[in-house]
A protein has these predicted regions:
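Active-site loop/lid in soluble adenylation, ligation, and acyl-transfer enzymes
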Residues: 4-137
């Protein structure tokens, strides 16, 4: 099938996948497929945890690790004999999935509410509180 023929298929035809076909796809594509078919946004700052099935986070981490290994190879870094880069792709993938974008892949925590016994009508700040975020730029 030519690229133009593929591009001209309807959205429904491009989106329909059998369970068998889905099972053979990388975790990122399965998750993206669920988001697209549910017509849900998946921008950089969106929480997509509802579309990540059990076990897929580990698969996603392995997929990211493989891509990062490719990046290191493209940068002409000897990751096999340079002890400084041993398992770098694995560590960086873990950092992105479990730390930098943690709020993306795990459900948001419940918000705790307290009664306003003092009837305050101003913002109360307790700190200092350090906040770190990944900018989508």
């Amino acid at each position: 099938m030519s690229q133009q023929t593929t591009d001209n298929r309807t959205t429904a035809e491009r989106l329909f996948r059998s369970e068998e076909e889905l099972a053979g796809m990388p975790a990122s594509e399965r998750i993206r497929y669920r988001l697209v078919t549910a017509n849900k946004r998946y921008h950089a700052n969106d929480n997509i945890s509802a579309f990540v099935h059990e076990g897929e986070l580990a698969e996603l981490k392995a997929e990211v690790q493989a891509k990062l290994q490719d990046v290191l190879q493209a940068l002409v870094i000897d990751t096999h004999s340079d002890h400084n880069t041993n398992e770098t792709a694995k560590r960086v993938a873990k950092m992105y999935i479990e730390e930098v974008f943690r709020g993306r892949y795990v459900p948001m925590p419940a918000v705790t509410e307290f009664p306003n016994a003092e009837r305050l009508n101003e913002l109360m700040i307790v700190g200092p509180i350090t906040i770190r975020s990944a900018c989508s730029h």
